[in-house]
């Protein structure tokens, strides 16, 4: 790690901690973050230990020169340290005037440090110099603490320092809080977490189940219009081609960040060979807005005895190509048939009315690709990132798809940096955040009142250990909450709590993801309650104690809120699965059969206090 010491004071080893500054000679401990042209992201070279990080930094005015190093870094209150035996790398474009007091300048640009050349920097502080850079009267030292230094980490939770501050989050937290800045145009080509450019419209998926269907695969795609899907069972791989690279990039980054899992298999994500869109497909997209989805209207015509069944549609249409899914809306007399490719759908729209007399009087055209619908979670994430006011998230749905994709990609890039910087590469996609040193009398309701920034899947409080594990629906929300809590602190009952990463949550189950996209949350809304009539009963039903007793049979209840003036109440569960179960079962209770039951809004998904 590189820190700056004022050149006029570098001989005073006893006052080194007082002389730490950045390139601009202010009191900020961090080097300034780079502009988009100078941005550089480096992955750590070591794969061991829980403190690995990706450190993104570099001075704005130094061109392509990069001075933060690879390796395991720990941020202490007054200095930087680096774990021993890790490699580092300097990149010199001729701007830096490299000087070395101990050795020759040529030794400065080696990829692996030479331990025999290290010399004592300060006996009092137990520092050892690795390298030194001089620029604009500032000296930049890379150094490490000796191995006999006492560990500053909490024994119970190695992800947080003893003072409650996460050691590696500060730089990446700054990246998140400044996430509105544009991402770099040219990304590192060899960076596996490249969220900024796509080499192809086609995403490769490896280790897929041999019996995987097109529908099962595309149930996981929510990033844009799909041109074509190919599954190769004998090679256990698949290729999903989109009509544009931005949609491919969003799916690629989302699959990596969320650790795409299909059929209990961890899916390998990569890029397919770059290809051009078929000229026929491109022309029909341009003129007719062609998609994989074929719309058939006027399915119920006067004189016809019955609707067209899904089985009959499959028989009539399977000759045109593999079918993804079929949806029939009988009351409207319409059907939507998704094919595996746009070309197959074009063949149906062009030839079906001609080749099959039954469809001559039907309305046949293109519908919207189901993979291009913006989910509730995407709306929520994009709204927070774009600073949309609470309650206006639905307006995101009407925004330009590419605009939303860019916002989600920038969020994904920041989330990946946060997750890997603090917990290593294996922490990518983790949705569980650890909260420690909680007040002894804390209630789970108080924690939920303090957690903001994302919908929750579950929250678990261990009262005997004064710790809590919060699992978000989306890993992006978890990473942002972790960063903001580490940067600004997380307090409950005016006590600052420790923040770290919990055990990896794994990917969100697809069934739960679909439920969330349809509005599911851990909050159950009960409306049309007659509180006046209930008060006249000998035993009231709609009291907090009675409702808690009724709803507790489906899972732990976190909070119950009453709004008598609106004739409703809200029951918040600690787990979203319990809320889904309650919504499904509560109608069997005679007191609730005539009431309006739906999902409410999870208050933990509100905008974080720091960003309001």
Swiss-Prot record:
Presence of the UniProt keyword Cytoplasm in the record: yes
Biased composition (Polar residues): 42-57, 115-125
Subcellular location: Cytoplasm
Keyword Nucleotidyltransferase assigned: no
Domain RRM: residue ranges: 201-274, 292-379, 431-504, 522-602
Compositionally biased tracts (Low complexity): 1-28
Name of the protein in its database record: RNA-binding protein MRN1
